Design a protein with these regions (language model features):
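Structural beta-sheet core signal
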Residues: 3-5, 51, 124, 149-152, ...
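A structural signal for short hydrophobic beta-strand segments in well-ordered beta-sheet cores
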Residues: 25, 162-165, 213, 224
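N-terminal glycine-rich phosphate-binding loop and ensuing alpha1 helix
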Residues: 1-66, 97
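Conserved beta-loop-beta/alpha segment of the NTase-like Rossmann-fold superfamily
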Residues: 60-166
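Well-ordered alpha-helical segments embedded in enzymatic catalytic cores
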Residues: 36, 109-112, 212
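Catalytic-core segments of class I nucleotidyltransferases/pyrophosphorylases
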Residues: 121-123, 130, 135-143, 155-158, ...
Length: 258
């Protein structure tokens, strides 16, 4: 099953960093967040990726075209241009890098990948969020309901600690960053049948999270896989610092691979 990765947005909330490189290429522990997401899928045996490029897509193309230069030590013979790779850090991945337009919206980018998917089910997620989700269990769940789409949902942590205050304004308890308001939100990590493409009808201007998803839900074609454990997007510099802190302290829950 192919995995589509949305990697073309402008990342405006991280403009301090995305003025230089696209958001999926921002580092966690010296590796792009996109690499971390792909490692999760690969751990469960899914190694055929289609990366949907847009803003600064060249940086992503260059990374994979020169993967060994980024991941390994090399010796280059300048007399003939030959290169010897040391401590080979190869991956069992097949990576298609698909230019989907600078200003295309999410639905438009997905629609442009239709010819690469054909009539088979596929997976889809955003290139800016990591999770310890069990992809194998997600796919099994999708096969149980027979509908067009499974969307993973999560309950994000609150941004701030919460106070439990009695009637006299006495603080009885402090909870450090509890779950938010209890709502389940779209966490990406979709499994889709090909009929999902039929719901994307507005070309490059189609926002996948608006009419396509709304109409799929209206037609009772969407089930959700509730993920109760770790999920975190990289939306702000604060998120980036937190993810790096987790990685550098060997406490990264999404590191399911060995």
């Amino acid at each position: 099953m192919k995995v589509l990765l949305l990697a073309g947005g402008f990342g405006t909330r991280l403009s301090e960093e995305t003025d230089i490189k696209p958001k999926p290429m921002l580092d966690i522990g010296g590796k792009p967040i996109l690499w971390h997401i792909m490692k999760t899928y690969s751990h469960y045996g899914f190694n055929d990726f289609v990366i949907l490029l847009g803003y600064k897509g060249y940086y992503i193309k260059e990374y994979f075209a020169n993967y060994f230069l980024h991941q390994s030590d090399v010796t280059i013979d300048m007399s003939d241009g030959s290169m010897e790779i040391h401590n080979n850090s190869s991956e069992p991945w097949k990576v298609t890098l698909l230019d989907t337009g600078l200003d295309s919206m999410t639905g438009g980018r997905i629609k442009r990948a239709q010819d690469f998917i054909g009539d088979k089910p596929f997976m889809l997620t955003y290139g800016d969020g990591v999770s310890d989700i069990n992809i194998e269990e997600l796919v099994k769940f999708h096969k149980t309901h027979g509908k067009a789409m499974t969307m993973t949902s999560a309950q994000p942590d609150g941004r701030f600690g919460a106070l439990n205050i009695d009637d006299n304004n006495k603080v009885k308890e402090f909870k450090e960053k509890p779950k938010g308001d209890g709502s389940w939100i779209n966490a990406g990590y979709f499994v889709c049948e090909p009929k999902v493409f039929d719901y994307i009808v507005d070309g490059d201007s189609s926002v996948f999270e608006q009419e396509p998803l709304m109409n799929l839900a209206r037609d009772s074609e969407v089930y959700t896989y509730k993920h109760h454990d770790f999920w975190m997007p990289m939306d702000t510099l604060r998120d980036k610092h937190k993810l790096n802190e987790l990685w550098n302290s060997d406490k990264a829950p999404w590191r399911v691979w060995s």
